[in-house]
Amino acid sequence: MADSVLAAVRVAPSTTELRELPMPELSDDAALLKVEVAGICGTDVKMYAKPPFGDPVIMGHENVGTIAVAGKKFKQLHGVAEGDRVFVEHYVGCYNCEWCRIGEYRHCEATDWRTNTDARRYGYTSSENPGTLWGGFSEYIYLPWNAVLHKVPDGVTAELAGLVTPLSNGIEWALLAAGVGYADTVLIEGPGQQGLSQVVACKQAGASKIIVSGTTRDKARLDLALELGADDVIDVEQANPCETVMDLTAGRGVDFVLDCTSRAGVGPVLLGIDALKRREGTLLIQGELAAFPDFPIKLLTEKAITIKSARGHSYRACELALEQLSSGRFPLERLSTHRFGLDQVDHAIRALAGDTADKNVIHISLMPWLGKEK
């Protein structure tokens, strides 16, 4: 194996550079993953433009690859061997707290970079920390003993497995957090990666009517929502969304509103409150809304609306996402729209942000070895 690794390192806002980094030394309880796919999502767009800190970082938190080399203890602990394909959660938990013990690594303080300056999380941790390779925009990533792995089922390609993060979020947020189930009616606001993943989750859970809203520029995504199981779609720039929801539900409104818009302000939340049924609907807020002046609390209480929030995913949701991919029930390969190599990281992130000429971008696969191997 080579002595160095090629990685795209974020060195400033909206700037990465390719660097040759030393291959980390491995203890008996560590391993190296050869990265096949690192998915790119909206979080990458945000962290690329406005890094939370100035240290050099190898971004990439949706990582799939094969075990290149592993110590004996690592193999025993995780039940893996060289050559196994795995999906790696971006959380690197302590494995000792109450959250880690139930597979909720997202809540572990050891992986929360917001409150812990020494946190470990793929795509966020500085490359100056021990292990160096803490992100998927690299030929290899470092796996400590407490990395969280999921074996990828036979028949699921690396590119398809690169969808585990958005799909697991869809399962976690729509089903496990909001509680969508059999015969429920749902409005999903925003047909991006997360919204489309929630279409699939709600369909599989038995929802009786799934409505997806978006803007005129989302036409290709709204069309895909119908292919994935949505019953109706609404272009909010061409029709009154609340009136349309009421028409589609015979005036009743929906049981659940799942707001997965980004940078859309308070409008989707207000629409959600209006579109919910007369009593005891549920609104799940998943976006980055920082404040809400004059929040309509009176209407909220009059309609007995339950508001929930969602962030990240559990171990169980990732396993369910892999089962979903393995089943072949839905054309999930349609979510993965673009491929880029390691030397195209800046372009790839900008493409997802809508700042390039690339069309109909949904989920991007960053492939470090693209064009390098036969």
What feature does the model see in each segment?
Residues 177-182, 204-205, 211, 219-223, ...:
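Glycine-rich cofactor phosphate-binding loops and adjacent beta1-alpha1 units
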Residues 1-69, 135, 139-143, 365-374:
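Short N-terminal strand-loop motif that marks the start
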Residues 2-7, 224, 239-240, 247, ...:
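C-terminal hydrophobic helical "lid"/dimerization subdomain
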Residues 24-38, 51-101, 105-106, 153-155:
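Glycine-rich beta-strand-centered segment in the early N-terminal region that forms part
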Residues 83, 139, 148, 153-239, ...:
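Mid-domain Rossmann-like dinucleotide-binding core that forms the NAD(H)/NADP(H) cofactor-binding site
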Residues 282-284, 295-334:
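Rossmann-fold dehydrogenase core element
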Residues 41, 89-150:
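Cysteine-cluster motifs in flexible loop/terminal segments that predominantly coordinate metals
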Residues 86, 186, 255-257:
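Receiver (REC) domain switch-region micro-motif
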